[in-house]
Amino acid sequence: MQITKYNQSCLLIETNNKRILIDPGNINYTDEMYNKKWVNIDAILITHRHQDHCYAEVIKKIIERDNCKVYTSSEVDKYSHFNNTIIVKENDAIEIFPNIKIEVTHAKHGYLTGMRESNNEIIENIGFIIDDGKTRLYTTSDTINFYNNYKCDILCMPFNGNGLTLGIIDGINFAKQINPKLLIPIHMQHPKDIMNPNINQLKQELEYNGIKYKIMKIGETIDFDIENISY
């Protein structure tokens, strides 16, 4: 499984000759992404409707160009009206391609005062596990802590806190429940620094708790080898 990190929580997963784009959002977006990076897309997964995860204008162009399907919640569908949408919900498990399955996980977006009045409250939030038969990658979406017994090899999750998502301490607790072979922090490119985690503190806590991790730059790609993890 090959993983490329893009803006905020966006990931491009390449496996079994398929290209799966997760949460293409508007933060740090450039036209090069649409024109050269987010090309030949076979499926798009969207966790929730906030624009840093769902840049509707660009997603519609990708769908039209590549004729790909979008797997997302009914709330995203209500606001975005994408063509080729497959509506999914928590606990669904779907084989989207031969030997590639997605599992739809629980996710609970945090709430700040005023989000409901400004129509930014997230009612329906989901995460995804991509399983290609060899590797399981779990991207959590913007979620606060909850009990779970999800299993994965690669865990992609936020640590920025601020009442909206997992912070560093509760994020470590969340990660230890899952015990991944590799953790990739996401959701760290907000233009306001106060909305991003303290990277040095995050590294210290991950290392103290013995969690193997990789902090990826935008555009960076890794090939995950379950037998030889050396990041």
Region spans (language model):
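Beta-strand-turn-beta hairpins that frame and shape the catalytic cleft
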Residues: 1, 14-20, 93-103, 131-137, ...
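Active-site-proximal loop/helix segments of hydrolase catalytic cores
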Residues: 112-176
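Binuclear metal-ion centers of metallo-dependent hydrolases, dominated by the metallo-beta-lactamase
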Residues: 4, 81-96, 172, 176, ...
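Short gly/ser/thr-rich secondary-structure transition/capping motifs
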Residues: 2-5, 24-31, 53, 84-88, ...
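Pre-active-site segment of Zn-dependent metallo-hydrolases
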Residues: 12-49, 56-61, 111-119, 143-149
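Active-site environment of divalent metal-dependent phosphoester hydrolases
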Residues: 27-29, 50-54, 77-80, 92-95, ...
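Active-site HxH/HxHxD metal-binding segment of metal-dependent hydrolases
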Residues: 33-97, 101-111
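Active-site neighborhood of phospho(di)ester-bond hydrolases with catalytic His/Asp-centered motifs
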Residues: 21-25, 41-52, 70-74, 137-141, ...
